[in-house]
Design a protein with these regions (language model features):
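Secretory targeting and sorting signals
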Residues: 1-31
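Residue-level preference for non-acidic, small/hydrophobic
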Residues: 49, 68, 99-102, 106, ...
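Short active-site loop at a secondary-structure junction
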Residues: 58, 82-143, 193-202, 279
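N-terminal carbohydrate-binding/catalytic regions of secreted carbohydrate-active enzymes
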Residues: 53, 64-85, 92-93, 100
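Hydrophobic (often cysteine-bearing) scaffold residues that line and stabilize catalytic clefts
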Residues: 41, 45, 94, 98, ...
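Catalytic loop of the DD-peptidase/beta-lactamase superfamily, centered on the K-T-G motif
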Residues: 2-5, 27-74, 266-402
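Short, surface-exposed loop or secondary-structure junction motifs
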Residues: 133-343
Length: 402
């Protein structure tokens, strides 16, 4: 997302202390890509998770995978009322991490000859992108994926924000939305800049990307994700919710501040949400293990031909307003950690959930993290995973990609 700041501190009284659980699975393998021993990384990640809970987040889960060695960590609670601890295999809304799946599908469709990334939006969706200075004849599929289309971010619309980012959301979260309905919110505004002028994060473009997936294949967007990614990789814990409002089990509660006030201490259970409100810009539900499996396969060259993977990793400088990464390609961003390790991945923010998955360039080491709240995030988790326990301290960041 663009405008909503997701960094917020403030204690939640019902979380008196962290509930920390760690687990190791699979045999040890040779390590690569970091100057920190495994034990330091695991201890550092767990400490960063515990610190985030102490700072007021209900609960955190993470999985760090290096080769065939898997470490799972949890901290805090899944339910503020019962005190039930979080568990490592919980499903959560991965939000904008969905964008990496969407870009992968479109690139795979290109490899199959179904479309070209240089096709215009007008070619696939005639008459959809027009009015208020918007022109689908001048925007390519590639520009949707790398956020250089210039299309207005629909989540920045004042009416939309009132409906979905305030207490009104307690009712509106049950509404079913069509992709076209969502796109029209963005198209009611003039574009922010001419197509191709710069990178600027826009969910509007990814809704259109999902619509193009359907036009090019004759199948639903969900069908294409399952066909090209989930089934080949055996991702049995990953689902596309459609217009369902419920979460598959096991899952934690999702807590939202529903306010831009950084001093608020009032939080709401928003676990139930109509999945249609996100679509291809952020609807997927998954687990840390499944998302790690996806990024490992993607960056390891198992999902896309070399030409398409190279295109995905061709980066543009981040012009904002979303913080947290320095470059963005096609549904994939990158940045360097404090110790110089370059990581590739994506973050996601939904009401009641913040998540990130990052990996080394070859996908050998992958980290997936989820917090069941939307008001604070810690860069220390990633820093510790790739640089060691003393790399960073838990604290605030800017807006996370929504």
């Amino acid at each position: 997302m663009t405008v909503r700041t997701m960094a917020r501190t403030g204690a939640i009284g019902l979380v008196a202390a962290a509930v920390a659980v760690t687990a190791f699975t699979a045999p040890a393998q040779a390590d690569s890509g970091s100057g920190a021993p495994k034990s330091q990384r695991h201890q550092g990640v767990q400490q960063a998770m515990d610190d985030l809970v102490k700072a007021g987040i209900p609960g955190v889960i993470a999985q760090l995978r290096t080769g065939d060695r898997v470490w799972n960590g949890t901290s805090g609670v899944a339910d503020l009322q019962t005190g039930k601890p979080r568990r490592a295999d919980e499903r959560y809304r991965i939000a904008s991490i969905t964008k990496t799946f969407v870009a992968t599908v479109l690139l795979d469709q290109e490899a199959d000859g179904l479309l070209s990334l240089d096709d215009t939006v007008e070619h696939w969706l005639p008459g959809v992108v027009q009015g208020n200075g918007n022109d689908g004849r001048k925007i390519t599929v590639r520009q949707l994926l790398d956020h250089t289309s210039g299309l207005f971010e629909y989540m920045g619309d004042p009416g939309y924000r009132k409906k979905f980012f305030t207490k009104e959301y307690l009712q509106s979260r049950y509404e079913t939305w069509t992709p076209l309905q969502t796109v029209k919110v963005g198209l009611a505004h003039q574009p922010d800049f001419a197509p191709g002028a710069r990178h600027q994060y826009s969910n509007t473009g990814y809704v259109l990307a999902g619509m193009i997936i359907e036009k090019a294949s004759g199948n639903s967007y969900a069908h294409e994700v399952r066909k090209r990614i989930l089934k080949p990789l055996g991702m049995r814990n990953t689902t596309l919710p459609g217009n369902s409002v419920t979460m598959p089990n096991p899952h934690s509660k999702a807590y939202s501040a529903l306010s831009d006030d950084p001093n608020t201490t009032e939080y709401f259970d928003v676990t139930e949400q109509n999945g249609s409100q996100a679509f291809a810009d952020g609807d997927i539900i998954s687990t840390t293990g499944d998302v790690n499996r996806f990024f490992r396969a993607l960056l390891g060259g198992r999902l896309l031909p070399a030409e398409q993977l190279k295109a995905m990793k061709t980066m543009h400088p981040n012009a904002g307003p979303v913080a947290g990464y320095t470059e963005y390609g096609l549904g994939l961003y990158s940045y360097r950690t404090s110790c110089g390790v370059k990581v590739w991945g994506h973050s996601g923010g939904a009401s009641g959930a913040l998540s990130e998955t990052v990996a080394t360039e070859d996908g050998r080491r992958t980290l997936s993290v989820n917090v069941n709240a939307d008001w604070n995030w810690s860069p220390a988790i990633v820093e510790s995973a790739f640089c060691g326990a003393k790399a960073a301290k838990a604290g605030k960041t800017g807006p996370i990609a929504r």
